[in-house]
Amino acid sequence: RRENNFWEQLVYNTPLKKGLISSRLRLEHRFQEKLPLQANLSLRKFTFSSRIRYRFTYQYLLTQSDVKVPINLVIFDEVFIFLNPNGTPYGFNQNWTFLGFKIQFNKKLVLSAGYQKITFKRSDNDYFKNRLWTNTLVYKL
C-alpha cells in the first residue's frame, strides 16, 4: 500500500578521538493508504499517524585517520514508538539494530554495509523478527 511520510529531526554528534557518538530524535508523520486498495484514484483514502524514532549510533575508526578511504565500524539501535492523536507516546512499534561498516570513498560517496535485525510488533506478545544484510550507498549532489 502507498505511504507518504514527512518528518522533523534533531541530530547531536559527539566527536571522539577515534570515532563518533550520534543521537537522532525524529518525529515522523505518516499518511498510509487504507485497505482494501482502490484502483480508482478518487476512491483512495489515507489514515494519518505519528511516531517518534530515537537512534543511538557509535562509529569507531578502524583505519588511520589520514588514509584516503577511511573505514568505520558502525553500531546503532533505533526504537520506534507510536504516538496517539494528541501526541502522547503509547506503544512500541519496532526496533532496528545494526552492526556493520561505513566506507567513505570521498566527500560525496559513502557505502554502509552490515547485519541488521528488525523486530516489529504485530500485536500483543506477537513480534516478527527479520534478519538481513543491508547495503546503503549514498551520493551527495
Q: What is each model feature region?
A:
Residues 75, 86-87, 92, 96-141:
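Predominantly the C-terminal beta-signal and adjacent terminal strand-loop region
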Residues 2-6, 46-54, 91-97, 129-133:
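Residues that define the transmembrane beta-barrel architecture of outer-membrane proteins
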Residues 17-21, 65-71, 105-113:
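Repeated loop/turn-to-beta-strand initiation elements of outer-membrane beta-barrel proteins
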Residues 39-46, 84-87, 121-123:
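Extracellular loop and loop/strand-boundary signature of outer-membrane beta-barrel proteins
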Residues 14-16, 27-33, 77-83, 117-121, ...:
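Transmembrane beta-strands of outer-membrane beta-barrel pores
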Residues 8-14, 25-27, 52-62, 99-103, ...:
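Residues on the lipid-exposed face of transmembrane beta-strands in outer-membrane beta-barrel proteins
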Residues 11, 20, 55-59, 72, ...:
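Membrane-spanning beta-strand positions in outer-membrane beta-barrel proteins
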Residues 1-20:
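Hydrophobic/aromatic-rich structural module bridging two neighboring secondary-structure elements via a short loop
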